[in-house]
Amino acid sequence: MKAKAILLASVLLVGCQSTGNVQQHAQSLSAAGQGEAAKFTSQARWMDDGTSIAPDGDLWAFIGDELKMGIPENDRIREQKQKYLRNKSYLHDVTLRAEPYMYWIAGQVKKRNMPMELVLLPIVESAFDPHATSGANAAGIWQIIPSTGRNYGLKQTRNYDARRDVVASTTAALNMMQRLNKMFDGDWLLTVAAYNSGEGRVMKAIKTNKARGKSTDFWSLPLPQETKQYVPKMLALSDILKNSKRYGVRLPTTDESRALARVHLSSPVEMAKVADMAGISVSKLKTFNAGVKGSTLGASGPQYVMVPKKHADQLRESLASGEIAAVQSTLVADNTPLNSRVYTVRSGDTLSSIASRLGVSTKDLQQWNKLRGSKLKPGQSLTIGAGSSAQRLANNSDSITYRVRKGDSLSSIAKRHGVNIKDVMRWNSDTANLQPGDKLTLFVKNNNMPDS
């Protein structure tokens, strides 16, 4: 079947998560590939409108036509094929989950002139779960161990793990395999085996067979049992997906509405706030941006967020309207009165959470309000006093510009941003008659971005 035209743009799609056992890698890839880490990253073009395939395009038809590796008839492939075919519902579910990622991954593989069979490895590795982690701490859809990730430029910090970032990890995985393929003289089966078990093991197996006068092709090498199954799994999947109708496997209909579009962030922003503006759940947003480990986007990781295409315009409009503007650390002007302010306790508040939110100490809160303990009641008023702690509030505050929208009130704006109405009035000269489009300056802490 001839594939219909597909525009393989740099657009990611993400489906639902799955759990399952993931294989343990013994990758021992060296740092030699670091120099190529950015070679293709800079070439990754994004379609900011979320466009990924031409009308009537069929992703699986395209991939099926590109699966061109020869598949020998042997017991190892036959065994893996039978295992997959005994659970056809799994094949449907995992390809549905894989579809979102496939647009970008297949595009990168095609651009690099690599075998399309490689896009099937994340099915073998992790069932396309970006949150998957093995016992050896291999992570992401490509199951990359920490040391290999570092060798290939994958940033791993407390707040961001590029091994779970689909773009970064795919770039690294393909860089690895390109390097390995050169090492093994263009033999892709040996390349895939080395990706799984490490180049050292494959080279040692080749050396052993040469010394014994045996063949050095993949099927003849004395490799670990996992690796002996790893390559056949990839080839079994290739045969099944290429001939899905013959095998009675129902592949999901591709749906471009699941495509993720990149939305730029000019500064760090709370994930809960982005989810609210985009109209999606926080859990889905975390899956779409699995590399981010904390609750803040655009801090340690990429300066953009991936959201479904159908939500991208809504998010861009919200960002542009000033619901959240670029945040820059700003000291409150010297002539701004900071003698005191009043905070109304909300349900769920604790003394420590209020202190953290406002940049003051719990001791100061107790002193200013003559509190003997830490017990609070919703609706209770707390005075935030002057002095050093008040100045710390100013020093730890951020200035944002909020553009008033239809239906807004001074009260709703203040509540949304966790500030006091009196402060909003103090920071802005004319708040008596708010109109849509009016701009307000607010001083808030980064961790006090609106969450509703």
From Swiss-Prot:
GO terms for molecular function: lytic endotransglycosylase activity; peptidoglycan lytic transglycosylase activity. A lipid is attached at C16 (N-palmitoyl cysteine). Its EC number is 4.2.2.n1. It is found in: Cell membrane. Residues 113-198 are annotated as: Slt-type domain. It is a lipid-anchor. The active site is at E125. PANTHER family: LYSM DOMAIN-CONTAINING GPI-ANCHORED PROTEIN 2, MEMBRANE-BOUND LYTIC MUREIN TRANSGLYCOSYLASE D. Murein-degrading enzyme. May play a role in recycling of muropeptides during cell elongation and/or cell division. This is Membrane-bound lytic murein transglycosylase D. It comes from Escherichia coli (strain K12). The gene is mltD.
